[in-house]
Regions:
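Bacterial N-terminal signal peptides that target proteins for export
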Residues: 2-11
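C-terminal motif of bacterial Sec signal peptides marking the signal peptidase cleavage site
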Residues: 20-23
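N-terminal "domain-start" segment that seeds a small globular fold
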Residues: 29-62, 82
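Conserved helix-turn-beta segment immediately C-terminal to the redox Cys motif
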Residues: 67-68, 76-77, 81-106, 124-128
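Thiol-based oxidoreductase modules, predominantly thioredoxin-like and allied folds used
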Residues: 98-115, 131-142
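Thiol/selenol-based redox catalytic cores and closely related redox-interacting motifs
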Residues: 129-209
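Non-catalytic, surface beta->alpha helical segment in thiol-disulfide oxidoreductase systems
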Residues: 203-223
């Protein structure tokens, strides 16, 4: 077996294990935004929000006006973690044309991002040579979710998983925890992506099951 095939098998096994862990040991995170919070979101734009970087600095999204932005919640121990590679490639290919990528580690899904911010950064640079900005680990669902995510979810809710070999397994896992899971805008799993256009609108939401080529085409159309 070649090294490439070994890596493919490794990540496939990891995703299977992580989904099993989700079924056995995790619950669907609580509903995200109240009606009042959603009403507040309507009056805001993405440029009203700030984030904390992995090193503790402040990042004003207003500084990204006129850019196309890909925002993704990530984890280092997930079967979707190899998506770091095509995400980094997109950053290198399109950053000069106006693409920005914001990586927001999150430990809410199967506990798959347990490391410190420094450990997560070291993992990503060592295994995937990432160069795009990485934020401080944060929640994307529930009472402690980032205000940015309350806004993002108010703009684009969940529309279903894409055709994928793990689609039925994901759906069964969430249905077991909450029969109404598909009606809620919450982030469902690691590597959910939001694409922001140059005017600050949420152009698209992609679930982790989405083909990376489809995401790249969306980004290219906005540059």
């Amino acid at each position: 077996m070649t090294k490439k095939n070994q890596r493919t098998v490794f990540w496939a096994v990891l995703l299977t294990v992580s989904l099993c862990a989700g079924c056995c040991g995790t619950k669907t995170p609580p509903a995200s935004a109240t009606a009042t919070e959603n009403a507040k979101c309507v009056r805001k734009t993405i440029y009203d929000y700030t984030l904390t970087t992995g090193k503790g600095g402040k990042l004003n999204l207003a500084d990204y006006k006129g850019k196309v932005i890909l925002i993704v919640n990530t984890a280092t121990g997930c079967g979707f973690t190899p998506q770091y590679a095509p995400i980094e490639k997109m950053y290198r290919d399109y950053h000069a044309r106006g693409l920005e990528i914001l990586d927001i580690p999150c430990n809410q899904f199967g506990g798959q991002a347990p490391g410190t911010d420094d450990e997560i950064h070291d993992f990503c640079t060592l295994h995937f040579n990432t160069t795009f900005p990485q934020m401080k680990k944060a929640d994307v669902n529930g009472p402690n979710e980032l205000p940015l995510y309350t806004w993002l979810k108010s703009q684009k809710g969940f529309q279903g998983f894409d055709e994928h070999k793990y689609k039925s397994r994901l759906e069964a896992m969430f249905a077991k925890a909450d029969p109404d899971w598909a009606k809620k805008p919450d982030i469902k799993w690691n590597f959910t992506k939001f694409v922001i256009d140059r005017k600050g609108n949420v152009a698209a939401r992609f679930e982790p099951t989405a083909d990376m080529a489809k995401i790249e085409e969306c980004i290219k159309s906005l540059l």
